[in-house]
């Protein structure tokens, strides 16, 4: 199959997910990834908005305009502030990602690292602002475990250093660390 979605077994996909991904793909010449907005699933309840979702949606605002989908500068600025793209909401376009593979050097930020690498390529990051799925937030997740053990800080700092000088990366990481509180169930 030319399109691959990294679905998690405990996430829920809405009926519009496939429609929205295919509609966005039709607007592209060379799509790299296609992704939708998402909601959270906490304790069996759908959460459509909270502080973290608001920040992520704000970061992704430029990508509501198709003219920015192929703009590497815009994509990289979005990623330089944090991981606003929800991994299970992403569909990869395999034929446009030759020689790409996820690296196995992190526990939590594997996806952010992947988007950073892909953001350097020519092509589009196609985004639809309609929620296409629900991402389950739970205490047993790798992200929650790493936050509890403070293991995620090193990974976040590593990622910020891909975009910023060390001292700026440290400042952003301190602010970013506060957002981790929203991963608590």
Task: State the predicted function of each range.
Residues 14, 43, 142-144:
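Conserved protein kinase catalytic core
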